[in-house]
Amino acid sequence: GVFKVTMNESLAVALLTNLLKNAFVHNIDGGHIRITITKNGITFRNSGVEHPLDKEHIFERFYQGSKKEGSTGLGLAIADSICRLQHLNIKYYFEQNEHCFEISQS
């Protein structure tokens, strides 16, 4: 199988931009960002604070795991809303000191 999503271009741009911006804003100096696309989905991974964030609240509007300049607490809520609208799953997990956001088919 192939990970294939058909959606409005503006929604696709908003989804990917919000996840990428989140990875940049909440990274550490000298950190890294990895984007992986597989047949099962797309994953954004980044270095950052060295502990997991609050999975229960991370996709809520105005939630901020860390106070960073340039962050409104809306990006992940928007990404979550777009995923739900498009019948996609988005989940957060912390693995090998990386913050991971994975989008997959429902």
Q: Each PLM stretch: what is its role?
A:
Residues 75, 79:
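Short alpha-helical Gxxx[C/S/T] motif in the catalytic ATP-binding
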Residues 4-7:
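Conserved micro-motifs of the catalytic ATP-binding
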Residues 30-41:
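Short beta-strand/loop element within the Bergerat-fold HATPase_c
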Residues 50-62:
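Short conserved segment of the HATPase_c
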Residues 12-16:
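A residue-level detector for a conserved hydrophobic packing site
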Residues 22-24:
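Short helix-loop "hinge" at the ATP-lid/N-box region of the Bergerat-fold HATPase_c
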Residues 88-92:
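Conserved glycine-rich
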